[in-house]
Amino acid sequence: MEKMLVGCLLMLGQLFLVLPVDGRERPQARFPSRGRHVRMYPQTALLESSCENKRADLVFIIDSSRSVNTYDYAKVKEFILDILQFLDIGPDVTRVGLLQYGSTVKNEFSLKTFKRKSEVERAVKRMRHLSTGTMTGLAIQYALNIAFSEAEGARPLRENVPRIIMIVTDGRPQDSVAEVAAKARNTGILIFAIGVGQVDLNTLKAIGSEPHKDHVFLVANFSQIESLTSVFQNKLCTVHMCSVLEHNCAHFCLNTPGSYICKCKQGYILSTDQKTCRIQDLCATEDHGCEQLCVNMLGSFVCQCYSGYTLAEDGKRCTAVDYCASENHGCEHECVNAESSYLCRCHEGFALNSDKKTCSKIDYCASSNHGCQHECVNAQTSALCRCLKGFMLNPDRKTCRRINYCALNKPGCEHECVNTEEGHYCRCRQGYNLDPNGKTCSRVDHCAQQDHGCEQLCLNTEESFVCQCSEGFLINDDLKTCSRADYCLLSNHGCEYSCVNTDKSFACQCPEGHVLRSDGKTCAKLDSCALGDHGCEHSCVSSEDSFVCQCFEGYILRDDGKTCRRKDVCQDVNHGCEHLCVNSGESYVCKCLEGFRLAEDGKRCRRKNVCKSTQHGCEHMCVNNGNSYLCRCSEGFVLAEDGKHCKRCTEGPIDLVFVIDGSKSLGEENFETVKHFVTGIIDSLAVSPKAARVGLLQYSTQVRTEFTLRGFSSAKEMKKAVTHMKYMGKGSMTGLALKHMFERSFTQVEGARPPSTQVPRVAIVFTDGRAQDDVSEWASKAKANGITMYAVGVGKAIEEELQEIASEPIDKHLFYAEDFSTMGEISEKLKEGICEALEDSGGRQDSAAWDLPQQAHQPTEPEPVTIKIKDLLSCSNFAVQHRFLFEEDNLSRSTQKLFHSTKSSGNPLEESQDQCKCENLILFQNVANEEVRKLTQRLEEMTQRMEALENRLKYR
């Protein structure tokens, strides 16, 4: 009775202290929050006593996305510090870890990091805002896999130490949370989910433990999160409810902070009353890979098969039983498996007998003639209809028709074919007789059989004959005799000049000096070619009124109609020539393109080795280039003006920075060509700390320093770094890269020599397309500060942008190529330009090598030596006010050495220094902090713009 009273008092106290998120309607304070209702929690004083001797492993997970501003982030830290106040923190009581997340997860400290509450509080105060994305699921996964591992300080599960996650978030996650949160809860982790502002309530419920009214909380803003402190003190410090209440759990009672939940044994699930348990039907939700039947068992399942099937060795698939495998069961023909037994089957054309095993041939015509007009005949597998002699089967395969032998056999009768009962014969038309071959016909010759009386010709007709006259004669009235015909008597038949009778007809004649035209009637003047060749190169041929020129065989007439040229034998076919087919007389020869020679077969072509066959005169190396060659120089040399001899670059100092476009329009294959281009330039320089210093930037949507001017002291190391350079492959922010180069790459911190040394500063900017930002501002600043700018563009590079980048004169500092095949020529010209710059500098050597010069501040460049660490340490007030800057964790090794050497040197640095200097340093620090803040704000705005731009490009 006493336990029940205590439990009721505790639960009553919670009802007054906490108003958690719940699906049921409860009285709640409401206020506007963009159209949503958010629950207000009352401010309740903390309990006087802490959670003494309370053993727990507690991990805070804090949303550090960009949507959380600086003020709200400070409120979250205050909330954590308030929670820590009532916890008994120590290795044997409560252990505390903390993660914060954005696009990635940052482990601020693990469960084993700190042993005292003061250490945890100090770490919370030093946390820095990540200000990136919202990967909530990733943070929970990290806590499950790493933060609660024994290696990170979590106590073993066998010790039954509660594992608790307290997660604070203010927005919709960018990844999935439900599955990973459920997995964490199933391992025994208790999750409190706290939402601030416009958080989706369903998302919070997917994260938090059940019942949601005890583990899911929602407040309007970060200022109200402190109202939850007392709620969590009650939940984290309460006694075990299972021991003081009549819980009525059917199987197990599990304590939760301030409450309890019922759990079931393996193979059972909790009923809707949240107390009783029922057997879990594992087959109800999925078949578990069972091919046919899934049968539920207590805590498990088995796969079973239908009748006629057996379970395979994998326990899931089913195989049909082969009843005919061992014997044919007396079947005469075939044994066939049925669903749960077997049956006998006969071959085609046979039927199964009554014993269901033997077979008999089928008599298809016994019961019916199947509609056959003449005869029904049994075949192998069916009945066929057959016709009597002299008949053939119709397309219906049943009725018959008389055979048309004349149509079927095509006997070749010249006139007519006549069918008979069993065959056919040929017959001739009237006036014809059948020839002995029985097929062809001959006309009856009436003229040969009787005396017809015809004077000249007798002509057979269909049934008799007629007399006819020879050509040039006409039949007389007796129809037998003939008289010569006068064709010109009645008409001149269209003759232009005169009509003359001939033996058989007439002919037109022309006067002297004329010839008859092809129409046989009109006349033309005599042959035009007889008077001259009329300029015809080969032959002149007269036409009706004039002439035409013709060419000999193998030639064709040109457009002038007079001269001739040889036929193009290569026009329609190349005759197997690999490169070119060229006409040669009346034949052809094969020829090759420049840079190639003809092979022995006279058709294929082989590349010429011009360097091998020519006295090229190259001092170092000869390289074939089509039908010509190029001279190249060894490492450290450049080509002289004659294009053949080589000269060494002056080994003077130079600070050279490559700015390389790594955008996706370039492509990985061309990026390799650019890397060869860079190493070629490096080969022409005497790389050392005192001579040539080289740095390299790669850019796309961001700028990446591959190595600085002080990165390498030898060409070998530098070329190796270029070879291993990774392709970025995104946008093209050339202006951003020029800004980075101007502000950072040529600073003494990154290895540049100060302007006072007058060491030439050279930048080689390579790009293959239009920049996505402005290049003119930073290109102008770089040139104004003495940096010689070379612009190299390939492909789609914009000439106007290249001109804005390049130094004057443009023709010496701008190089453009349509493709990457001419990069070698550009490389040689660049080497010459760089060598000229070295020669103009007079071969000066930089004695400072890699050390930073200890000189006065140069007004033209914001070098980091303007204010040194030892100057800061000399100002005691500044050092005390900003002691965080000089703690061990925040100083580099070099700064620590300087600090200790200053203290041990015995110099009067503290009070003897000029106080004005200290005040100036503090003023500078304030101004610098303000500038850093402005730059940070601009960087955030630029980052947002870049992300929006990348998203637009992604979905184009």
Curated annotation (Swiss-Prot):
Residues 917-955 form a coiled coil. GO terms for cellular component: basement membrane; collagen-containing extracellular matrix; extracellular matrix; extracellular space; matrilin complex. Residues 57-232, 655-830 form the VWFA domain. PROSITE patterns: ASX_HYDROXYL, EGF_2, VWFA. Residues 1-23 form the signal peptide. The keyword Glycosyltransferase does not apply. One of its GO terms (biological process) is glial cell migration. Disulfide bonds join 242-253, 249-262, 264-277, 283-294, 290-303, 305-318, 324-335, 331-344, 346-359, 365-376, 372-385, 387-400, 406-417, 413-426, 428-441, 447-458, 454-467, 469-482, 488-499, 495-508, 510-523, 529-540, 536-549, 551-564, 570-581, 577-590, 592-605, 611-622, 618-631, 633-646. Glycans are attached at residues 221, 890. It comes from the Eukaryota. GO terms for molecular function: calcium ion binding. Detected in a variety of organs, including calvaria, uterus, heart and brain, as well as fibroblast and osteoblast cell lines. Residues 238-278, 279-319, 320-360, 361-401, 402-442, 443-483, 484-524, 525-565, 566-606, 607-647 form the EGF-like domain. Pfam families: EGF_CA (PF07645), FXa_inhibition (PF14670), Matrilin_ccoil (PF10393), VWA (PF00092). Its main location: secreted. Keywords: Coiled coil, Disulfide bond, EGF-like domain, Glycoprotein, Repeat, Secreted, Signal. It is found in: Secreted. Involved in matrix assembly. This is Matrilin-2. It comes from Mus musculus (Mouse).
